[in-house]
Amino acid sequence: MQTQKARNGSPDVPKKVSPRAARPLKIAALEPESSSSPISATNRTPKDKSPNVLNRRSPRSPVSEKKRPSRITELELLVSQLQEELKKAKDQISVSETSKKQAEQEAEESRKQLQEVSSKLEESQNQFVETSALEEETDKTGSLVFQSVSQECDWEFSATAGERAGLAAVAHEIRQLKLQIEMVASSEAGHVKQAELYNSEVQLLRGNLMDTLFHVENFRNQLKDCEISEAETEALATETLRQLENAKKAVEELKSDGTKAVESYKKMAVELEQSKSRMVWLEALVNKLQNNPADLENHEILLKDYESLRRGESNEMDEEVSSLRCEVERLRAALEASDKKDQEGNVEASSRLRIQAELQSELKIAKSEIDELKARLMDKETELQFISEERDNFSMKLMKNQKEIDVEAELKKLREAIENLKADLMDKETELQIVSDENETLKSDIHKSETDVQDAFLKLGIAMEEADKSSKKAVRVTEQLEATQASNSEMETELRKLKVQSNQWRKAAEAATAMLSAGNNGKFAENYNQTNSPYSEDIDDELTKKKNGNVLKKIGVLWKKPQK
């Protein structure tokens, strides 16, 4: 009775039954074409078991048969689009990974370049440690900057792509690096200013050096003049010494001549006195003889007597007489000679007086010459004293000149030191130029490395953005796949339920047909045909459309959610 009510009752009953019976048919038509569905075997078994039901339900409208493949194709297109998008996302992820690897390689290359630059900078530091404290500070700051850059680049490039929060810190550190580079540039500007100060000091030193060289030349000229004057004074001193020696010799000769003249004068005076005394004696004798000529005869008588006596005496007396005669003869000769001498004595006296006068005049001349020589000797002594004083002064000058020579030697040493300082300064200038050139090259390298790092960061950011986009797309695709899998699981559960219900309905229908086959064949067939009428199929189609529409709406909502 209940089965009759169900068949002959209100049209709500087939509405409840038809959608449940229509769903498995729809999904059964979808699932054989999709090879990924695991329920295809379970959907085929009821077809094998109940061919009659399928044969009964086979006559359907062509519109529903046309609509079903279109929805299936839409779902297949959605699935294929999702798969293509998943492939694209995977490709983008691989591209982003390759770009990330390239960026890491470029970063490693830039890090190597920075390490090479830092090594070069360290070598330049080792070479120019002794130049100046400023250069050491600049080199240390540069080395610290490059080490910090290299360490930060190492730290930045060793970070994984997942550490997105460190990008802000990296940007901050890049700003700090830029500030440090600006500080280095400012320190280099200060270094340039100090180099300019050094150049100004060098110019001042050059001016002082020119002044010292001018003074040295003046000292040289003065020294040459002193040497010339010294030679002249030495020549004058030798000449004066020679003249002094000649004067001494002349004085000695004059002294010897004077002594000889004095001695001869004394001798002549003695002889003159003797001649005067003789003349007096002869004059007295002559006067006596003139006054007493008898004495002369007496003398002759005495001589004759004496001779006679002597003749009578011994031979000794003869000898005495002869001696007396000789004496008398001598006396006569002496008288005669005295007379002659008296005459000659007057001449000789006059001549002697003349000679004496001449000698006195010569003596006066000699005395005057001696006085002159004494005066000249005094002059020479004064000149000699003056020369000795000049010699002392000259020795003092020589000492001063020796000091000046020492000063000149020191000046030479100072000049050599200044030349060495000039050479060192030129070397330092060349080294400073080289260091400035190297700093410029390092600046350019740093700028290039900064640009490379910025490009790498830009590429990394682009790669990160692409990776984020691809990850978002992958997440969206995975969510869509999960949603489709969830919807598929829901549909599978519903299909299982519908299979169970369809089996129950089939069993009930078979039981009803078995029970009513005896008397109600026509009515049951009619009702059965009514249930299998195109109207019921249309209702089933509408219900399946609604259900599929709801499923499609759910899929569309799930598709649109990640895009928001």
From Swiss-Prot:
Domain of life: Eukaryota
Expressing tissues: Expressed in flowers.
Phosphoserine PTM sites in chain numbering: 533
Annotated disulfide bonds: none
Chain segments annotated as coiled-coil in the UniProt record: 70-133, 231-514
Compositional bias per record (Polar residues), positions renumbered to this chain: 33-44
Keyword Coiled coil found: yes
Region Disordered, annotated ranges: 1-73, 88-135
Entry keyword set: Coiled coil, Phosphoprotein
Homology family: Belongs to the ICR family.
UniProt xrefs under PANTHER family: INTERACTOR OF CONSTITUTIVE ACTIVE ROPS 2, CHLOROPLASTIC-RELATED, INTERACTOR OF CONSTITUTIVE ACTIVE ROPS 3
Task performed by this protein: Acts as a scaffold, mediating interaction of ROPs with different proteins.
Quaternary data: Interacts with ARAC11 in vitro.
Name of the protein in question: Interactor of constitutive active ROPs 3
